[in-house]
Amino acid sequence: MAAKEVKFGSDARAKMLRGVDILADAVKVTLGPKGRNVVIEKSFGAPRITKDGVTVAKEIELSDKFENMGAQMVKEVAQKTADLAGDGTTTATVLAQAIVREGAKAIAAGMNPMDVKRGVDVAVQTVVDDIKSRSRKVTTNDEIAQVGTISANGEAEIGKMIAEAMQKVGNEGVITVEEAKALETELDVVEGMQFDRGYLSPYFVTNADKMVAELESPYILLFEKKLSGLQAMLPVLEAVVQSSRPLLIVAEDVEGEALATLVVNKLRGGLKVAAVKAPGFGDRRKAMLEDMAILTGGQVVSEDLGIKLENVSLEMLGQAKKVVITKDNTTIVDGAGSKEDIQARIVQIKAQIEETTSDYDREKLQERLAKLAGGVAVIRVGGATEVEVKERKDRVDDAMHATRAAVEEGIVAGGGVALLYATKALDKLTAVNEDQKFGIDIVRKALQAPVRQIAQNAGFDGSVIVGKLLEKGETNFGFNAQAGEYGDMFKFGVIDPTKVVRAALQDAASVAGLLITTEAMIGEKPEKKAPAGAPGGMGGMGDMDF
């Protein structure tokens, strides 16, 4: 086992604090509407430019291992806040740095670290309760757009686009962000259920110019096995022909004779038909077919359920207003399933999302939920150069997470104001002893840090602004750094999601509390490599053969 290097007490804390400061100082320049960019070197290609706190934090790795431990702990704060709320990572980093700094001073002055930490914990819980009590529900589309705009660094176009996407796909719908090849940023909304399987044969196409198959008010047959012959299907095919409506077949696969027969019938005009493979694999495929059945008001033809192809009637088939099939995707628009059944299925999938421990499964379940509940919106981010597109995509991602958080837990006054005024709630707290009281004071001081930093990044004096706001004492009164003026933050449209503010403080205090109570640090001792031996001299040439 390699030898270890151990540091104790103030030595350990000084090193750790240095690491915290390096990381936090790099991250906090990005805070606020006038925050600056950070340029990150990449091992290949152009450097990356970003204003996203967690992206900056992830890139920082220090050469001194003890300093690096401090930096990695604060990186954890940013990462945790990003995972939980999707935004607020820079605020969390600024708060963590402020709590650690003040905490280190308290410990150096001889206070009991555990009591100081208890004081911090009590204060944080009080502040969180206070912020929640002042939270307002998001009621209008404009408020959603404002939250998005603030998170996208004042770019109103992004805020509006996200609000529009959320309006179209609903709160359960999925909004994805992709890089576009064009200059413009655009929104593309797919209503209904879309899955990534296209037509099995180009002969199914109904619109040759666009190479798509469009079926108006079709019947939909959902079959979980492979279709290799059509003999068993003849009764249902005849019934569909009688009804003069098109048919979509979704099966594990349609091969050989079955596919050839369908294509021939389609070309002769006897039967308007298209066939696609079912999405997913294994159990997930079964679940997705079941989703489609509920959405379209049909049944999955499955031998597990005792249903055979020969016995299928028209009533067992699903129906939809329209189905559009391209070579890569199939979209079912306006399925005929009952609202109650769809709602029950949504509740069931939500329960599975709560229970699952796998991130991959959770992601897939959320996709299924979105397809059932509303649809999928894609924001394609454009720009003049690849660097610009990547920078903007970071901001759109942040804005999207922030708006989701706002819908979930409501909104509070932005610009660090909600945290600043929460200091009033701390006045009512009574501490058990002096050290705990100091812990409460640490949080009181730290809550001023975001407002100070936002003002500083905008070129104003943070202390003066904090003083003015506390003097005024109105909970929504703040400083709009973008315009350089004081006023009601809600009227300015400067608002933050409650969830983001809460998560930033809780995550910052959690890690900062651990750093304050650290008394020893253990790191690998670098092994000294033995110096390379001197090269041997030239040998004589006596043994050479000629």
Swiss-Prot record:
Chief site of localization: cytoplasm
Record PROSITE patterns: CHAPERONINS_CPN60 (PS00296)
Start and end residues of each stretch annotated as Disordered: 527-546
UniProt protein name: Chaperonin GroEL
Places the protein is found: Cytoplasm
Gene: groEL
GO biological process: protein refolding
General function of this protein: Together with its co-chaperonin GroES, plays an essential role in assisting protein folding. The GroEL-GroES system forms a nano-cage that allows encapsulation of the non-native substrate proteins and provides a physical environment optimized to promote and accelerate protein folding.
CDD domains hit by this protein: GroEL (cd03344)
Keywords: ATP-binding, Chaperone, Cytoplasm, Isomerase, Nucleotide-binding
Sites where the protein binds ATP: 30-33, 51, 87-91, 415, 496
A Pfam short name: Cpn60_TCP1
Taxonomic source organism: Rhodospirillum centenum (strain ATCC 51521 / SW)
Signal peptide limits: none
Compositionally biased region (Gly residues): 534-546
Stored NCBIfam families: GroEL (TIGR02348), PRK00013.1 (NF000592), PRK12849.1 (NF009487), PRK12850.1 (NF009488), PRK12851.1 (NF009489)
